[in-house]
């Protein structure tokens, strides 16, 4: 079994992050334009807090980069078993999405998150596979 190429893993994660942001702008922007549905609006209404500033945006991007690098690590870990094609990227993104969905469902059940959080999970069901497929095009084993 080949070792995971750490440099390529980080690069693939960063590329996946940019792909995620691009698809998020298209998907969520379209939904907001067509149906006036906004994930950010639901969270702002539920938590009544307005975050902004440079540190907020730097941390938000840093967390997104970390998430995408972790997803690409899942992809790299299952790649020897599933092969290096789009199916593996989709499986990795669905594994990650399922963990996030169960975490969100638990918090909705506890009353911590609003039920509208599932709309964001629906958006992620589109955004994550595309991001991992784009990232998988960059990743190569070392």
Please provide the spans of the model-predicted regions.
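Juxtamembrane/disordered regions of integral membrane proteins
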Residues: 1-142
């Amino acid at each position: 079994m080949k070792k995971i190429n750490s440099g390529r893993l980080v690069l693939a994660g960063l590329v996946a992050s940019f792909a995620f942001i691009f698809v998020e702008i298209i998907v969520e922007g379209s939904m907001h334009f067509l149906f006036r549905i906004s994930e950010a609006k639901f969270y702002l209404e539920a938590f009544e807090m307005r975050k902004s500033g440079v540190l907020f945006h730097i941390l938000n991007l840093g967390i997104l980069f970390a998430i995408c690098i972790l997803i690409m690590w899942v992809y790299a870990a299952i790649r020897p078993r599933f092969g290096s094609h789009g199916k593996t990227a989709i499986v990795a993104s669905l594994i990650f999405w399922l963990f996030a969905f169960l975490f969100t469902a638990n918090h909705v059940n506890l009353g911590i998150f609003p039920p509208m959080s599932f709309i964001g999970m629906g958006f992620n069901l589109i955004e994550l596979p595309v991001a991992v497929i784009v990232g998988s095009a960059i990743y190569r084993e070392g």
